[in-house]
From Swiss-Prot:
UniProt function note: Pycsar (pyrimidine cyclase system for antiphage resistance) provides immunity against bacteriophage. The pyrimidine cyclase (PycC) synthesizes cyclic nucleotides in response to infection; these serve as specific second messenger signals. The signal activates the adjacent effector, leading to bacterial cell death and abortive phage infection. A clade E Pycsar system. The pyrimidine cyclase gene of a two-gene Pycsar system, weakly generates cyclic CMP (cCMP) from CTP, has little to no activity on ATP, GTP or UTP. Expression of this and adjacent effector SaPycTM (AC P0DV39) probably confers resistance to bacteriophage. The genes are probably only expressed in response to bacteriophage infection.
Reactions the enzyme catalyzes: CTP = 3',5'-cyclic CMP + diphosphate
Species assigned in the record: Staphylococcus aureus
Residue positions binding Mn(2+) 2: D84, I85, D128
GO function term, MF aspect, one: nucleotide binding
Lineage of source species: Bacteria, Bacillati, Bacillota, Bacilli, Bacillales
EC number: 4.6.1.6
Localization in the cell: Cytoplasm
UniProt-recorded name of the protein: Cytidylate cyclase
Classification via CDD domains: CHD (cd07302)
Enzyme class label: lyase
Keywords from the UniProt entry: Antiviral defense, Cytoplasm, Lyase, Manganese, Metal-binding, Nucleotide-binding
Length: 423
């Protein structure tokens, strides 16, 4: 991931510079010419994950889908993300209030830009915490959840790299960032106006929005806690999920549930392993290359295209930028960038996860008909996050290196938990 640290370093530094300019006499001139100077970093993130067009939301408060609500109620799904940034108050022990405000604002603003890069809507800033909505009426539910976990993962990566480096350079302990995410389906999220004339807001009423905040509070430091519905909708591989462990009188105790009551039943929570998740991308460099002579995307990379047979065309699918529908024809290609990477043979392997693939006993299989070729064809079939793997062998049939390409598949017809009483 070393190459991508630059994006976050530039994003954070640009926000510091931007807010420093607010106190400068030359700000008005500079602002007219450079008010969008920080946007290229956001655009880089969007392009990296295949996001096209303008960002979804450029405002805070009311979700753009519900500007017209007056004295009515509307039901519509949402994926809620709550992030809390603790540790920034220690800045006040070392700096003047002006400088504390500068750094805190740069941290919050950088977080906002990361969430907006994935089409998140900033609903509320609460001190060092931010409530973000992912999803809107034109977006598939699976894509809203994918956007949320991708944004949350990069937010934690931003903290583990750029912000950690900054705080250590100031001889301060790094920040502790906790993120909670949950999903409420259409019938479980009510949008309406709260308050009185002139003092009101349009917001969501949903236990799943409330639980996002609870999950944040339950998350270990610098981790992401996801609700049961997140996994139910995407069917995330177990290798990217874990049960929170707490010590009780020296004994490890599993904390599986956020709710465990007779009237509401059980509702589970799990830690989303964002480091493992990001490290499994073909398009992102690994966290460590110490034992790797060749690795993606520096020396090689798998790319994927959706084949549109009807229109005799193809469109590139950016890894895990969105979910693919079932029964889509795909073309995978291995691109070699390092001329020193000499190999004798290539083998392709499909690794599926999830209940649907398990039921059909199609979890892993070799693509033998494409042995020796730098491409292979496959079709989407099962809900979940699946991988196409490619292995390169030397003349002695020993593995030189390998790469894997992850893709989400979802028919957006998933059953999720509906807590509470429906109207």
């Amino acid at each position: 991931m070393v190459n991508h640290i630059r994006i976050f370093d530039n994003l954070f530094q640009s926000n510091i510079s931007k807010f420093q300019n607010l106190t400068s006499k030359s700000y008005i001139i500079r602002n007219d010419n450079e008010k969008n100077s920080y946007l290229p970093m956001v655009q880089e993130i969007r392009e990296l994950f295949g996001k096209e067009g303008e960002i979804f939301s450029k405002s805070i408060g009311t979700h753009p889908d519900f500007f017209g609500i007056e004295n009515t109620n509307e039901y519509q799904y949402i994926c809620s993300l709550f992030v809390d940034i603790s540790g920034s108050t220690k800045l006040a022990l070392k700096y003047s209030l002006d400088k504390v405000k500068l750094y805190k604002n740069a941290i919050i603003s950088s977080a906002i830009e990361i969430f907006r890069a994935f089409d998140g809507h900033i609903h509320r800033i609460q001190g060092d915490a931010v409530l973000v909505y992912f999803g809107h009426k034109e977006l598939e539910k699976s894509d809203a959840i994918i956007n949320a976990i991708n944004a949350a993962s990069l937010m934690q990566y931003f903290n583990a790299t750029t912000l950690k480096k900054f705080f250590e350079s100031e001889n301060l302990e790094p920040l502790k960032i906790r993120i909670g995410i949950d999903f409420g389906d259409d019938s479980s999220v009510l949008w309406s106006k709260y308050g009185i004339d002139g003092i009101n807001e349009i917001t969501s009423t949903s236990i799943h929005t409330d639980l996002a905040s609870k999950f944040q509070n339950k998350a270990p430091s610098n981790k992401i806690m996801i609700g049961e519905n997140i996994n139910k909708y995407l069917d995330i591989p177990k290798k990217f999920r874990s049960i929170k462990i707490e010590k009780n009188n020296g004994v490890d105790v599993e904390k599986r549930y956020i709710l465990n009551t007779n009237n509401l039943g059980r509702y589970s929570m799990e830690v989303f392993e964002w480091e493992k998740y990001l490290n499994s991308f073909s398009m992102l460099p690994p966290f460590s290359t110490e034992n790797e002579q060749f690795y993606s995307p520096r020396d090689l990379k798998i790319r994927c295209w959706i084949i549109d047979e009807k229109n005799q065309d193809k469109y590139e699918y950016i890894e895990r930028g969105s979910a693919l529908k079932k029964e889509m024809n795909l073309l995978f290609k291995l691109e070699i960038y390092n001329q020193c990477l000499e190999f004798k043979n290539i083998k392709w392997r499909v690794v599926n996860y999830g209940e649907e693939a398990k039921k059909d006993k199609e979890l892993e299989f070799e693509m033998n008909q494409y042995e020796g070729y730098q491409y292979c064809n496959q079709k989407t079939a099962y809900t979940g996050l699946h991988f196409m793997e490619c292995y390169l062998y030397d003349i002695n049939d020993k593995i030189i290196c390998h790469d894997s390409f992850g893709l989400f598949i979802n028919d957006n017809n998933r059953e999720v938990r509906k807590l509470g009483i429906e109207d």
